[in-house]
Amino acid sequence: TYRPKIKVPLSALDKAVEVTGITAVLAFWIYLAINYTALPDIIPTHYGGGGKADGYGDKISILGLPAVATVIYIAITILNRFPHVFNYPSEITPENALNQYTLMTRMMRWLKLVVVVIFGSIAYQTIATANSADPELGSWFLPVTMLLLYGTIFYLSLIHI
């Protein structure tokens, strides 16, 4: 089916979320660069559902966190330029396209910020507890992560129904 190709204008809040996201990505890399040399050679590389470290590896593996977060951020940023390719719960018509595209790109914008915050939090906790005898993210981490991801989707879906 035909879907109009429309450039979605950004609101002031959308622009603020974009700036916050870019700032978070840059802060993530800077924080890691500042703290990398102080890390022990072996650090936690995986955490179980309860937040306890259950996998260890070379400290260079921590670079995967900002790398993956950056790739996801860039990929969603690029994808957001093509809202007509997304899946929508209702049919897209010329009359509702701008509204639907705006809602979807806004949700994706918030989600990419949430992803960067989650990955940054994992890196922060890994650095903070790397020298600990019992490194952990904390039992709160998984529930908070799920709340951030699904809460963002639910809230943005709910307020725009």
Residue positions per predicted region:
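Alpha-helical transmembrane segments and their helix-start/interface "positive-inside/aromatic belt" motifs
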Residues: 9-24
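Select subsegments of transmembrane alpha-helices in polytopic membrane proteins
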Residues: 17-21, 75-77, 105-117
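Active-site and channel-lining beta-strand-loop segments
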Residues: 32-64
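Alpha-helical transmembrane segments
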Residues: 57-73, 142-149
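Membrane-helix interface/capping segments
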Residues: 78-95
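Alpha-helical transmembrane segments and their membrane-interface junctions
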Residues: 114-132
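Hydrophobic alpha-helical transmembrane segments and immediately flanking/interface helices
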Residues: 128-150
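Conserved small/polar residues in nucleotide/adenosyl-binding loops
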Residues: 159-161
